[in-house]
Amino acid sequence: MMILGIETSCDETGIALYEGSSNKIIFEALYSQAEKHNLYGGVVPELAARDHINRLLPLLKNKLDEEKIQINEIEAIAYTNGPGLRGPLMVGAGFANALSYSLDIPSIPIHHMEAHLIMAKFDSPQLDYPYVSLLVSGGHTLIVKVLSAEQYKVIGQTRDCLLYTSDAADEFSC
Protein backbone atom coordinates (compact mmCIF):
# COMPACT_ATOMS: atom_id res chain seq x y z
CA MET A 1 0.00 0.00 0.00
CA MET A 2 1.38 3.40 -0.98
CA ILE A 3 0.71 6.06 1.64
CA LEU A 4 1.36 9.76 1.11
CA GLY A 5 2.42 11.59 4.27
CA ILE A 6 1.88 15.35 4.64
CA GLU A 7 3.47 17.49 7.36
CA THR A 8 2.51 21.15 7.85
CA SER A 9 2.48 21.60 11.63
CA CYS A 10 4.65 24.74 11.60
CA ASP A 11 6.90 26.36 9.01
CA GLU A 12 8.17 23.41 6.99
CA THR A 13 6.23 21.76 4.20
CA GLY A 14 7.01 18.06 4.16
CA ILE A 15 5.77 15.17 2.05
CA ALA A 16 6.82 11.54 1.77
CA LEU A 17 5.57 8.49 -0.07
CA TYR A 18 5.80 5.20 1.80
CA GLU A 19 5.39 1.72 0.33
CA GLY A 20 4.11 -0.59 3.06
CA SER A 21 4.72 -3.93 1.35
CA SER A 22 8.45 -3.20 1.02
CA ASN A 23 8.62 -1.01 4.17
CA LYS A 24 10.39 1.61 2.06
CA ILE A 25 10.21 5.37 1.70
CA ILE A 26 9.92 5.96 -2.05
CA PHE A 27 10.50 9.70 -1.80
CA GLU A 28 10.52 12.54 0.65
CA ALA A 29 10.75 16.29 0.20
CA LEU A 30 10.97 19.18 2.62
CA TYR A 31 10.64 22.88 2.00
CA SER A 32 11.77 25.17 4.82
CA GLN A 33 10.39 28.66 5.37
CA ALA A 34 13.08 29.53 7.95
CA GLU A 35 14.63 32.40 5.96
CA LYS A 36 11.23 34.01 5.45
CA HIS A 37 10.40 33.90 9.17
CA ASN A 38 13.87 35.01 10.31
CA LEU A 39 12.93 38.50 9.13
CA TYR A 40 10.29 38.59 11.90
CA GLY A 41 12.29 36.93 14.68
CA GLY A 42 10.09 33.82 14.66
CA VAL A 43 7.36 31.96 12.85
CA VAL A 44 4.39 34.05 11.71
CA PRO A 45 1.51 31.51 11.56
CA GLU A 46 -0.45 33.31 8.82
CA LEU A 47 2.61 33.52 6.55
CA ALA A 48 3.43 29.88 7.24
CA ALA A 49 -0.10 28.79 6.29
CA ARG A 50 -0.08 30.83 3.08
CA ASP A 51 3.29 29.41 2.08
CA HIS A 52 2.05 25.84 2.64
CA ILE A 53 -0.85 26.63 0.27
CA ASN A 54 1.64 27.72 -2.40
CA ARG A 55 4.09 24.83 -1.88
CA LEU A 56 2.14 21.62 -1.30
CA LEU A 57 0.80 20.86 -4.77
CA PRO A 58 3.98 21.82 -6.71
CA LEU A 59 6.13 19.86 -4.23
CA LEU A 60 3.96 16.76 -4.64
CA LYS A 61 3.71 17.08 -8.42
CA ASN A 62 7.49 17.48 -8.73
CA LYS A 63 8.24 14.38 -6.65
CA LEU A 64 5.62 12.25 -8.43
CA ASP A 65 7.05 13.32 -11.80
CA GLU A 66 10.64 12.62 -10.66
CA GLU A 67 9.70 9.10 -9.54
CA LYS A 68 7.36 8.50 -12.49
CA ILE A 69 4.45 7.71 -10.17
CA GLN A 70 0.85 8.47 -11.08
CA ILE A 71 -1.20 10.23 -8.42
CA ASN A 72 -3.86 7.49 -8.59
CA GLU A 73 -1.26 4.97 -7.37
CA ILE A 74 -1.50 6.56 -3.91
CA GLU A 75 -3.78 4.39 -1.75
CA ALA A 76 -4.07 6.49 1.43
CA ILE A 77 -3.04 9.88 2.78
CA ALA A 78 -1.74 10.49 6.30
CA TYR A 79 -1.44 14.06 7.53
CA THR A 80 -0.37 15.83 10.71
CA ASN A 81 -3.42 16.89 12.71
CA GLY A 82 -1.55 18.25 15.75
CA PRO A 83 0.06 19.52 17.74
CA GLY A 84 1.11 22.59 15.80
CA LEU A 85 -0.01 25.97 14.54
CA ARG A 86 -3.72 26.07 13.71
CA GLY A 87 -3.43 27.71 10.26
CA PRO A 88 -0.66 25.48 8.90
CA LEU A 89 -2.41 22.39 10.29
CA MET A 90 -5.66 23.39 8.58
CA VAL A 91 -3.87 23.82 5.25
CA GLY A 92 -2.34 20.33 5.48
CA ALA A 93 -5.63 18.76 6.57
CA GLY A 94 -7.57 20.54 3.84
CA PHE A 95 -5.10 19.48 1.17
CA ALA A 96 -5.05 15.88 2.41
CA ASN A 97 -8.82 15.63 2.68
CA ALA A 98 -9.45 17.23 -0.72
CA LEU A 99 -6.92 14.93 -2.39
CA SER A 100 -8.26 11.83 -0.62
CA TYR A 101 -11.82 12.77 -1.61
CA SER A 102 -10.84 13.29 -5.25
CA LEU A 103 -8.97 9.95 -5.33
CA ASP A 104 -11.60 8.14 -3.21
CA ILE A 105 -8.98 6.91 -0.74
CA PRO A 106 -8.70 7.12 3.07
CA SER A 107 -7.42 10.23 4.80
CA ILE A 108 -5.73 9.46 8.14
CA PRO A 109 -5.04 12.13 10.80
CA ILE A 110 -1.74 11.57 12.63
CA HIS A 111 -0.54 12.97 15.97
CA HIS A 112 2.83 14.59 15.21
CA MET A 113 4.52 13.67 18.50
CA GLU A 114 3.28 10.08 18.54
CA ALA A 115 4.62 9.63 15.01
CA HIS A 116 8.08 10.71 16.20
CA LEU A 117 7.94 8.05 18.93
CA ILE A 118 7.09 5.26 16.51
CA MET A 119 9.81 6.21 14.00
CA ALA A 120 12.36 4.48 16.23
CA LYS A 121 10.71 1.16 15.30
CA PHE A 122 10.73 2.11 11.62
CA ASP A 123 14.45 2.88 11.72
CA SER A 124 15.31 -0.11 13.94
CA PRO A 125 12.68 -2.87 13.49
CA GLN A 126 14.58 -5.12 15.91
CA LEU A 127 13.87 -2.64 18.73
CA ASP A 128 11.61 -4.26 21.32
CA TYR A 129 8.92 -2.62 23.42
CA PRO A 130 9.18 -1.01 25.84
CA TYR A 131 11.86 1.52 24.95
CA VAL A 132 12.68 5.05 26.10
CA SER A 133 12.70 7.97 23.68
CA LEU A 134 14.05 11.50 23.97
CA LEU A 135 11.64 13.57 21.92
CA VAL A 136 12.69 17.08 20.92
CA SER A 137 10.33 18.72 18.44
CA GLY A 138 9.43 22.38 18.19
CA GLY A 139 8.49 23.60 21.66
CA HIS A 140 8.29 20.07 23.06
CA THR A 141 11.10 18.29 24.91
CA LEU A 142 9.99 15.00 26.47
CA ILE A 143 11.38 11.74 27.80
CA VAL A 144 8.84 9.06 26.98
CA LYS A 145 8.54 5.36 27.77
CA VAL A 146 7.03 3.77 24.67
CA LEU A 147 5.06 0.68 25.73
CA SER A 148 3.54 -0.16 22.31
CA ALA A 149 2.57 1.54 19.06
CA GLU A 150 -0.56 2.87 20.79
CA GLN A 151 0.59 3.26 24.39
CA TYR A 152 3.25 5.44 25.96
CA LYS A 153 3.99 7.29 29.19
CA VAL A 154 5.68 10.68 29.57
CA ILE A 155 8.31 10.28 32.29
CA GLY A 156 9.91 13.71 32.03
CA GLN A 157 9.58 17.01 30.22
CA THR A 158 10.86 20.56 30.26
CA ARG A 159 8.80 23.23 31.99
CA ASP A 160 10.19 26.62 30.97
CA CYS A 161 13.42 25.52 29.36
CA LEU A 162 13.95 24.81 25.68
CA LEU A 163 16.75 22.73 24.25
CA TYR A 164 18.63 24.44 21.44
CA THR A 165 21.20 22.95 19.10
CA SER A 166 23.61 24.71 16.82
CA ASP A 167 26.18 23.61 14.28
CA ALA A 168 29.00 24.50 16.67
CA ALA A 169 27.83 22.81 19.87
CA ASP A 170 24.84 21.73 21.87
CA GLU A 171 23.74 24.26 24.45
CA PHE A 172 20.99 24.49 27.03
CA SER A 173 19.11 27.73 27.62
CA CYS A 174 16.80 28.39 30.57
Residue ranges and their predicted role:
Residues M1-D167:
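Short acidic/glycine-rich loops and adjacent helix/strand connectors
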Residues D167-C174:
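Single conserved hydrophobic/aromatic residue that forms the stacking wall/gate
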